[in-house]
């Protein structure tokens, strides 16, 4: 197996040539320009300055960044408080059979307080990494990672430590023999998980959750709150779902999905469950309709671009509105309520401004989830504070995972682990039902793209083919020959006839090289080697003798072939 060593966060990450075992986002600090100065930024420059691509493989990608942009002042060192990661799991043969995926959102911060941000990031990152590193089911994992460690109890830390919290959206999926892929999903807070089929139709949504705190305030629960509550169901959205090969799982912090068109799924006096509008969401992927096998990065990029585009447009609308209100100096005119502001704008001919303000406040015109009741005296000062807070933005992270095709993973293992060819042979025999199965799998693998670096700014992303064409062509040829031979070895024929059929096949296939034949014989060994016991000489057959004669014949054929090749070169 071709291997590379990649240094990330001072840790050695062991990788194969086409995928990485584990990725987790590292600490990111960006320059956060004030809203007033940031209005002229176009989407491309906004993303290039603030977002990063973290790539595990064609099937697992993360885009992490921030739309934070404060009202008046630049913040030189603004820490991204989200974390996301993927840990791929394998069976005893090294074949990918599942993954653990998590995305965490550090709650609070973002005000330029470096000490506070560092502590929030620490909790966010450690929560994510602990989830990935645990080897238990999701319920046990959540229980374990929310238990305070002895080191934390002894630690003398700033007062912020006591109140530092993080929300989490996470899942584990695994391929169960005979049952297919099963996924365990958990959402604690305002992350959101959406499961799509391979045609981008929404199958399931693991909703975000907000808890009512009183005084009209709704906030997300956290892992820390989950650890201390007796009624965990009140804070946790938990689902176990059957998944299909090719399904796409998108997990996002609210800095991404909150910028899209949202939908209230359910509400009680104590809790809201929130998701995205399904009809709107499926339109995001119109450009991928004809793409045969888009990468997880392509999917993450499209959603991120749409979300940040809406964020910038919303921000520009708000800034323009705020400026128009402030230019009127209403405090000098004794205008103190929103109704008075609306009346003033209409009387003075600023009808468009009045309509914009009314739509934002009373009609959820920006789809940001905050609406007011009409015909109530609403203080202008309170609304101005609200409007300015809506321009701030948020840390924004998206993780896209595709459920792998098991045959693709068998082929990947066949390429990456040559020493396991013989062990994998019966798995191919059980899985492959036709040559078309192999053709489809190799076509998908030919489309796989991987980012050479684990992490890079989104403006610098570039991708390479995960496999060389000659590698796939050679492997497909060998496995196609194996399929034809193994299905053609009729067990109803006697031992001699089966060996004769195999010998005839190998001799007539001129494309087979010496190493190919040796590999095929190794893979077929369990099917053609002599049976032990009394049946070895059944009907007068001495299978050991026939087996040795067969191998001698093959060796002579290979020797003759080598001599012919040498003569042709003279």
From Swiss-Prot:
Its main location: secreted. Keywords: Host cytoplasm, Hydrolase, Secreted, Virulence. This is Phosphocholine hydrolase Lem3. It is found in: Secreted; Host cytoplasm. GO terms for biological process: regulation of GTPase activity. One of its GO terms (cellular component) is host cell cytoplasm. InterPro entries: PPM-type-like_dom_sf. Virulence effector that plays a role in hijacking the host vesicular trafficking by recruiting the small guanosine triphosphatase (GTPase) Rab1 to the cytosolic face of the Legionella-containing vacuole (LCVs). Acts as a phosphocholine hydrolase by mediating the hydrolysis of phosphocholine to Ser residues of host RAB1 (RAB1A, RAB1B or RAB1C). Dephosphocholination of target proteins restores accessibility to GTPase effector LepB. Can act on both GDP-bound and GTP-bound Rab proteins. It comes from the Bacteria. One of its GO terms (molecular function) is phosphocholine hydrolase activity. Its EC number is 3.1.3.-. It catalyses: [Rab1 protein]-O-phosphocholine-L-serine + H2O = [Rab1 protein]-L-serine + phosphocholine + H(+). It is an enzyme of class 3 (hydrolase).
């Amino acid at each position: 197996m071709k291997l590379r060593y990649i240094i990330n966060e001072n840790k050695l990450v062991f990788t194969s040539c086409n995928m990485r075992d584990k990725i987790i986002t590292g600490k990111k600090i960006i320059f956060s320009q004030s809203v007033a100065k940031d209005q002229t930024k176009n989407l491309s420059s906004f993303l290039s300055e603030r977002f990063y691509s973290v790539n595990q493989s064609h099937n697992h990608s993360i885009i992490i960044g921030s739309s934070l942009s404060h009202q008046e002042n630049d913040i030189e060192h603004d820490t991204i408080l989200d974390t996301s990661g993927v840990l791929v799991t394998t069976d005893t043969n090294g074949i990918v059979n599942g993954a653990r995926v998590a995305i965490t959102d550090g709650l609070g911060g973002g005000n330029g307080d470096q000490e506070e941000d560092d502590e929030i990031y620490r909790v966010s990152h450690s929560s994510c990494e602990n989830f990935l590193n645990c080897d238990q089911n999701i319920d046990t994992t959540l229980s374990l990672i929310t238990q305070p460690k002895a080191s934390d109890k002894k630690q003398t830390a700033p007062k912020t430590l006591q109140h530092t919290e993080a929300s989490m959206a996470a899942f584990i999926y695994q391929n169960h023999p005979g049952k297919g892929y099963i996924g365990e999903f958990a959402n604690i807070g305002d992350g959101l998980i959406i499961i799509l089929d391979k045609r981008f139709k929404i199958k399931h949504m693991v909703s975000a959750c907000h808890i009512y705190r009183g005084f009209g305030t709704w906030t997300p629960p956290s892992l820390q709150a989950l650890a201390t509550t007796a009624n965990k169901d009140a804070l946790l959205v938990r689902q176990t779902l059957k998944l299909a090969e090719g399904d796409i799982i998108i997990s996002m912090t609210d800095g991404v999905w909150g910028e899209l068109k949202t939908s209230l799924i359910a509400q009680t006096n104590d809790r809201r469950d929130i998701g995205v509008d399904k009809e709107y969401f499926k339109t995001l992927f119109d450009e991928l309709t004809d793409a045969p096998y888009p990468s997880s990065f392509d999917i993450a990029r499209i959603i991120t671009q749409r979300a940040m585009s809406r964020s910038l447009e919303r921000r520009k609308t708000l800034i323009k509105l705020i400026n128009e209100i402030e230019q009127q100096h209403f405090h000098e005119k004794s205008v103190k309520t929103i109704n008075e502001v609306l009346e003033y704008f209409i009387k003075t001919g600023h009808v468009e401004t009045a309509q914009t303000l009314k739509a934002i406040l009373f009609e959820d015109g920006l789809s940001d989830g905050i609406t007011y009741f009409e015909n109530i005296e609403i203080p202008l000062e309170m609304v101005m504070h609200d409007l300015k807070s809506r321009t701030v933005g948020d840390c924004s992270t998206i993780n896209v995972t595709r459920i792998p095709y098991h045959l693709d993973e068998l082929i990947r293992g066949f390429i990456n682990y040559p020493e396991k060819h013989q062990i994998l042979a019966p798995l191919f025999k059980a899985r492959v039902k036709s040559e078309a199965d192999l053709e489809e799998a190799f076509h998908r693998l030919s489309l796989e793209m991987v980012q050479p670096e684990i992490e890079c700014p989104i403006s610098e992303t570039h991708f390479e083919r995960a496999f060389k064409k000659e590698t796939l062509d050679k492997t497909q040829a060998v496995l196609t020959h194996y399929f034809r031979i193994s299905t053609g070895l009729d067990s109803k024929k006697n031992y001699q006839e089966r060996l004769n059929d195999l010998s005839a096949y190998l001799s007539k296939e001129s494309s087979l090289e010496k190493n190919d034949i040796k590999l095929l014989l190794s893979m077929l060994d369990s099917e053609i080697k002599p049976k032990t016991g009394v049946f070895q000489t059944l009907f007068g057959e001495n299978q050991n003798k026939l087996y040795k004669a067969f191998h001698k014949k093959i060796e002579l054929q290979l020797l003759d072939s080598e001599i012919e090749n040498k003569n042709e070169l003279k």
